[in-house]
From Swiss-Prot:
One of its GO terms (cellular component) is cytoplasm. InterPro entries: L-lactate/malate_DH, Lactate/malate_DH_C, Lactate/malate_DH_N, Lactate_DH/Glyco_Ohase_4_C, Malate_DH_type3, NAD(P)-bd_dom_sf. It catalyses: (S)-malate + NAD(+) = oxaloacetate + NADH + H(+). GO terms for molecular function: L-malate dehydrogenase (NAD+) activity. This is Malate dehydrogenase. One of its GO terms (biological process) is tricarboxylic acid cycle. NCBIfam families: MalateDH_bact, PRK06223.1. Substrate binds at R87, R93, N125, R156. The active site is at H180 (proton acceptor). It is an enzyme of class 1 (oxidoreductase). NAD(+) binds at G12, A13, G14, F15, T16, G17, D36, N100, L123, T124, N125.
């Protein structure tokens, strides 16, 4: 029998990339190649070896390799991009754009060269614009270039709702639309706890507070850490997307997808409900929006477009 093991490459061996690599290996979803720049090759190899040495204790079989050589990523089923400079306190997302766009373009050229059939999942911020940059640089079909923010934003929303109601997070579902920023749109109407609409369980002013905290969720953690940004929940969110693709689960997940007329928008990457499976983006789900939700989404789209203007 030939080698049927799946292969996932994670570009960027910082906190998020390394945690993602570990979670993917731990769940035995695939063998993992962790990649960073040549100056960081030894620390990257060290992290990979450290994870590998956890495998007998955790009881997982997966190869984990650290490298700065993209040849090692050849034939990846999925490539996850977490590389880029991090956002520091007081730094706007737009400050990140030019630097991270250059990184996206160079990384994407390597992905196209060594894994031309891969599906790319982008996490690097500002993620809507960075996913667009990767899509344009790769020449891949839109189904094979998707961004992660909605799974994370929705996870934050679900966490805060579960805390508010003192319920299991497993029983809370929700959806967050739009860009990954202060203008994201948590769709409360489509959010439930144990199948019961949230609006019947939580007073409006508490829901509004939860929505606001969700919007500021990334910033809250940046401020608490004082140095760096969230990585456990982002890595868990990436891993959920990777699992949905590798196992062809056809999960309904909010992802950053390329719109061609859906929701009335054209030629833009935006967070929308999607079906994620073996081909990557299987389908975009169009929800009926109220005038208020539509206005909020328009505002979110304008924010994304303003960031995209900075792209070369």
């Amino acid at each position: 029998m030939g080698n049927t093991r799946k292969k996932v490459s994670v570009i960027g061996a910082g906190f998020t990339g390394a945690t993602t690599a570990f979670l993917i290996a731990q769940k035995e979803l695939a063998d993992v190649v962790l990649v960073d720049i040549p100056q960081l090759e030894n620390p990257t190899k060290g992290k990979a070896l450290d994870m590998l040495e956890a495998s007998p204790v955790q009881g997982f079989d997966a190869k984990i390799t650290g490298t700065s050589n993209y040849e090692d990523t050849a034939g990846s089923d999925i490539v996850v991009i977490t590389a880029g400079i991090a956002r520091k306190p007081g730094m706007s997302r737009d400050d990140l754009v030019s630097t991270n766009e250059k990184i996206m373009r160079s990384v994407t050229q390597e992905i196209v060269k060594y894994s031309p059939d891969s599906i790319i999942v982008v996490l690097t911020n500002p993620v809507d614009a960075m996913t667009y940059a990767v899509y344009k640089e790769s020449g891949f079909p839109k189904e094979r270039v998707i961004g992660q923010s909605g799974v994370l934003d929705t996870a934050r929303f679900r966490t805060f709702v579960a805390e508010e109601l003192n319920l299991s997070v497993k029983d809370v579902t929700g959806f967050v639309l739009g860009g990954h920023g202060d203008d994201m749109v948590p769709l409360v109407r489509y959010s439930y706890a144990g199948g019961i609409p949230l609006e019947t369980l939580i007073p409006k002013e508490r829901i509004d507070a939860i929505v606001e905290r969700t919007r500021k969720g990334g910033g809250e953690i940046v401020n608490l850490l004082g140095n760096g940004s969230a990585y456990y929940a982002p890595a868990a969110s990436l891993t959920e997307m990777v699992e949905a693709i590798l196992k062809d689960q056809r999960r309904v997940l909010p992802t950053i997808a390329y719109l061609e007329g859906e929701y009335g928008y054209e030629g833009i990457y935006l967070g929308v409900p999607t079906i994620v499976g073996g081909n990557g983006l299987e389908q975009i789900i169009e929800l009926e929006l109220t005038d208020y939700e539509r206005a909020q989404l328009n505002k979110s789209v304008e924010s994304v477009k303003n960031v995209m203007k900075v792209l070369s």
